[in-house]
């Protein structure tokens, strides 16, 4: 089985490709807070190189809050802290670049930083980007040469700044993005730190965006962040990424928890910013952070976040394509958030893998051999297993869960009911334990599957699993064409109904969209897509006498219909169809 490897050659000689992956590096905040210095930053850069982290893809040394020294009262020029960085910031940036690394910086979308409000860093008052967007962007990226910026929002969130200044997130981050663009730099990575998923607009202005509140060094934090990100699959695409926050690997969690933390951050295409002190990192943590199989998954050229394929015995089975869309090679993870070990059987058909399947253990970086039909596995409490799979066949996907679909107006900043924006909710009575709800009342509060793939064009049965205790309308669109509007009622808010409609799909990728522009839609559990069997006709000379079998041609194959029954059963692609 071919090893999944992110080699030095790939990282160094194919720089354009490497730059497209999630950001990999180190950030000062988790360990040092505002108590940073020129010496600390330089030592972390030294350690990144001496410990070989740069060789496996870690490139960024990011200076977070704590470097500010106020502003010049006449010119408004941003000043650097006189004692923490006595030689200014250009010296530090040049030092980082001299190591073959990239340099990152921090600011706030408002006047004041989070460190000013929460950490008593009084000198950091008025140092945010607000009213200085272009001046600071020119300073950071043209004069100093930084390559990355994380922009916080304490200064724009009234309860988190002394001015009680409240700003609009979309307006501020769009303006900041424009200021960076105006510098002429096209390689600067903007990270939006609004703590919850800010809205679908962020994809157009940033390279990555935070999806939760700050991580802390503890299992409860990691578990909570994973829970928040399981159903954000649809929002990471085209080389833009959901940011699950900096890494706490190598601090106080158990070895198994560290593996889950790092492994799932890699598997879910989150940026990888180490947060521990690299000069004191444990050997075991360093080895984990340098796992090339996991890093290769994180930096895979498709840059698609995995989706939850199955929930089994309290565990989540997530899967994604790697290297090639809809190919025979996939990766899957089994994540156990529970406080006890779990035994489960993963059926390869649920992962669209057919025939003999060869597996590689990404944590162990070892081949496991070939398996048929399923994998029996025990996952320890708080543990994760990640596999790279090569299958003989790629099966056609039938079910697409609603919690993996895209909501055009999705956001997590404001109350979704008052804003009339959809959400993803846990629901034990649904097929995979979750659903999409609070949909409708505008065309943008819709539900879209952009990745419905079929091998052949033609007529398909599209079944919608829905939940509604009253009559509600759905308008179905396929590939941007309106198909029909219909009313449904499942008879209760914990009962899943099914509505099937025949639609035409094109070979390859299709888009299925559900909407209701004037009222609430039902909650949605899933859609299923199944090919309608091609028309059949009796062979010349075949008997049609009652009680005799009739012989039919189906896709060039001889099939039998038993006349003693009023129904015919056809087998196509290993599936039964009744006519």
Pin down the residues of each PLM region.
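Aromatic-lined carbohydrate-binding/catalytic grooves of carbohydrate-active enzymes
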Residues: 22, 40, 44, 48-161
């Amino acid at each position: 089985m071919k090893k999944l490897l992110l080699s030095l050659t790939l990282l160094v000689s194919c720089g354009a490709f490497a730059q497209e992956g999630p950001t990999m590096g180190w950030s000062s905040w988790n360990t040092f807070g505002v108590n940073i210095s020129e010496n600390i930053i330089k030592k972390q850069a030294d350690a990144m190189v001496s410990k070989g982290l740069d060789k496996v893809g870690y490139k960024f040394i990011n200076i977070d809050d704590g470097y500010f020294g106020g502003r010049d009262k006449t010119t408004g020029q941003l000043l650097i802290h006189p004692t923490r960085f006595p030689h200014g910031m250009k010296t530090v940036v040049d030092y980082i670049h001299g190591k073959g690394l990239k340099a990152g910086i921090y600011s706030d979308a408002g006047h004041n930083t989070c460190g000013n409000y929460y950490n008593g860093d009084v000198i950091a008052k008025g140092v945010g980007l607000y009213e200085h967007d272009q001046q600071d962007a020119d300073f950071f990226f043209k004069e100093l040469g930084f390559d990355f910026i994380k922009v916080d929002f304490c200064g724009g969130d009234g309860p988190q700044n002394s001015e009680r200044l409240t700003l609009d997130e979309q307006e501020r981050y769009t303006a900041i993005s424009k200021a960076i663009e105006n510098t002429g730099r096209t390689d600067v990575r903007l990270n939006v730190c609004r703590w919850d998923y800010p809205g679908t607009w962020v994809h157009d202005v940033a390279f990555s965006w935070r999806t939760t509140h700050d991580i802390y060094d503890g299992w409860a934090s990691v578990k909570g962040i994973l829970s928040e990100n399981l159903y954000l699959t649809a929002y990471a695409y085209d080389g833009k990424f959901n940011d699950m926050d900096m890494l706490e690997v190598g601090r106080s969690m158990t070895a198994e928890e560290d593996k889950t933390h790092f492994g799932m951050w890699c598997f879910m295409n989150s940026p990888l910013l180490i947060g521990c002190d690299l000069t004191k990192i444990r050997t075991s943590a360093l080895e984990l952070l340098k796992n090339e199989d996991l890093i290769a998954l994180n930096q895979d050229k498709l840059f698609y976040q995995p989706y939850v394929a199955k929930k089994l015995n309290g565990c989540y089975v997530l899967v994604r394509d790697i290297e090639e869309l809809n190919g025979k090679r996939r990766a899957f993870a089994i994540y156990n958030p529970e406080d006890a070990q779990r035994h489960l059987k993963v059926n390869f058909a649920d992962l669209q893998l057919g025939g003999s399947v060869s597996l590689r253990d990404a944590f162990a970086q070892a081949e496991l051999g070939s398996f048929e039909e399923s994998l029996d596995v025990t996952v320890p409490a708080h543990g994760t297993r990640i596999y790279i799979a090569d299958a003989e066949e790629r099966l056609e996907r039938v079910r697409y869960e609603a919690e993996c679909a895209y909501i055009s107006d999705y956001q997590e900043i404001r109350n979704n009911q008052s804003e009339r924006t959809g959400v993803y909710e846990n629901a034990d009575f649904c097929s995979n334990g979750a659903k999409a709800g609070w949909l409708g009342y505008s065309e943008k509060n819709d539900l879209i599957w952009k990745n419905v793939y079929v091998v052949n064009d033609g007529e398909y049965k599209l079944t919608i699993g829905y939940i509604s205790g009253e009559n509600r309308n759905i308008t179905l669109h396929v590939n941007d064409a309106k198909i029909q509007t219909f009313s449904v009622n499942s008879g209760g808010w914990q009962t899943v109904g099914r509505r099937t409609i025949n639609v035409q799909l094109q070979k390859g990728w299709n888009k299925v969209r559900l909407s209701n522009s004037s009222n609430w839609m039902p909650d949605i559990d899933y859609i299923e897509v199944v090919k309608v069997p091609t028309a059949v006709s009796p062979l010349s000379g075949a008997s049609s006498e009652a009680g005799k079998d009739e012989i039919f041609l189906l896709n060039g194959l001889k099939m039998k219909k038993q006349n003693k029954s009023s129904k015919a059963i056809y087998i196509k692609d290993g599936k039964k169809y009744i006519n």
